[in-house]
Amino acid sequence: MIEIVYKENKEQANGNEGYFHLPKNIRQVGDTNGRERIYLEDYVGTFLKKYFSAPEGRAAMLFGEFKWADGISYFFIRSAAAIHTMEPAPDHLVFDDAVWTEVHDVMEKYFKNQQILGWALSLPGYGEDLNEQIIRAHLNHFGGNDKTLFRVNGQEKEETFYTYEGGTLRSTGGFYIYYEKNEPMQSYLIDQNQNRSCLLYTSPSPRD
């Protein structure tokens, strides 16, 4: 996997949702396809890695902000939350009322000013393929170009984002990790009694 560390100057992009700033300190992971730019906040990425280190299947919800400018989709994933009411398996991915109640309760408490950007899924031992169940679950509950699926696959814990294109899900190729204080995510982690190494994680780049 290719990792490139650099600083990106603050920019403004003008799209149909107005002006917005791009993160300043970022780390590129893999090669992006140019049509989507996915920015994953570092606390979120660290939380997902730890949460998905379990041997059983697990799912999480992704929150943040979606923007569109100059033909490019921008996903700013600022938060994530474990879905405790779901026990995912390759042939069993159910988003029932209990799941959505849990998700909206978490949003109301921690991430009130953010939107659902998609979901994250780990199925240890299953492999990297997206089966019919995974694709159907995404299209039924996260349809549209403003939602994404984050997969953590295999023993190597390969991380891949997927977005909707041509009637199915396709890999975005790569993504960006960015750094900020992210108090809402820290508050969620503290209340969830996460590992201290996750809470006190210090990145090599400064958080503004």
What are these regions (language model features)?
Residues 1-115, 128-199:
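Conserved beta-strand-loop surface patch within small alpha/beta domains used
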Residues 201-208:
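Conserved small/polar residues in nucleotide/adenosyl-binding loops
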Residues 117-126:
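Histidine-centered catalytic micro-motifs
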Residues 122, 154, 206:
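Residues immediately flanking
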